[in-house]
Amino acid sequence: MNKLAIQDTYGERFQHCWGCGPKNDDGLHLKSYPAGEACICTFTPDKAYTGGVPQNLFGGMIAMLFDCHGTASAAYFKHRDKGLELTKDTVIGRFITAHLEIDFKKPVPMNSPVTIRATAEEIGERKVVVAMEMEAAEEVCAKAKMVAVAVKDNM
């Protein structure tokens, strides 16, 4: 797995997201890493993010994790598709969510790291379709499909 997080290659203007922005002092600082044909993100939920059912991660947080990891993965997949490598000097093109569909399979426990694996299903000129699975306690808890589009002034 690459040791350089995709989010750490965002341009200065795009580093303030609450979920994944490296420059948001109050944020979660999620990190997505290329790993072969996939991108991986691992997160251990804090008790503050439990939902209406105690000891389970709430759905909005699950959506945010898919959102941040999916757009970072889309940026990487497009970058790689251009034949480029991710380096400390990279300023990667930024993607945003156009559509996010989530299937909640089972509760996500709070006492276990969550791993999200993303793969590219389609890479177009400005659009990347990303498929994701969220695992916790060695079980798939949620699946998502995202359509991410490139921010025009950062490609």
Task: Label every PLM stretch briefly.
Residues 1-12, 106-155:
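HotDog/MaoC-like acyl-thioester-processing domains
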